[in-house]
């Protein structure tokens, strides 16, 4: 996923949860306008990695394009993601909150737009998040017999464009 982070929960309570995490659209708009705002400029994402407090979390990295590096300074973690190799590291977050990092390898023109947002929750809140996320993913699962309306298809296409295409082609499609 070029200039995005993909997260797959492979084991444990969240097993089966998977998503892409990319720079929040509002952050990209601030950057394009040359008007940075807020303390977490270029660090907010559309879908943070959510982990339980006090548990060992294993991060497995790889890449399919160039070398990246998953780095969150508050956890003392930096692991390179190298095409063709599987690498791992771990951390244990001891307090709840939002923690930020970035790709720590100069990986191309969108390198500055690869933030990492880890949301650490107490165990009971994490369990509730997992349950909600599994329900959300189940609701998104396509019914092969569903007949899509034009409005539904347009809405889905706009969401895909905003998440995957607008970074290069601009929100107005004229990039």
Predicted regions, residues:
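Non-transmembrane, membrane-proximal soluble domains of secreted or membrane proteins
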Residues: 1-166, 171-174
């Amino acid at each position: 996923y070029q200039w995005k982070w993909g997260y797959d929960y492979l084991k444990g309570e969240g097993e089966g949860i998977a998503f892409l995490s990319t720079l929040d659209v509002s952050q990209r708009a601030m950057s394009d306008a040359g008007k940075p705002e807020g303390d977490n400029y270029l660090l907010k994402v559309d879908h943070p990695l959510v982990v339980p407090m006090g548990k060992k979390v294993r991060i497995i990295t790889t890449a399919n394009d160039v070398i990246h590096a998953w780095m969150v300074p508050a956890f003392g973690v930096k692991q390179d993601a190298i095409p063709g190799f599987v690498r791992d590291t771990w951390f244990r977050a001891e307090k709840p909150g939002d923690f930020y990092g970035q790709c720590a390898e100069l990986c191309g023109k969108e390198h500055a737009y690869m933030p990492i947002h880890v949301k650490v929750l107490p165990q009971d809140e994490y369990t509730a998040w997992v349950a909600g996320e599994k329900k959300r993913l189940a609701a998104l699962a396509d019914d092969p017999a569903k007949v899509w309306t034009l409005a539904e298809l347009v809405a889905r296409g706009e969401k895909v464009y905003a998440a995957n295409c607008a970074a290069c082609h601009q929100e107005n499609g004229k990039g």
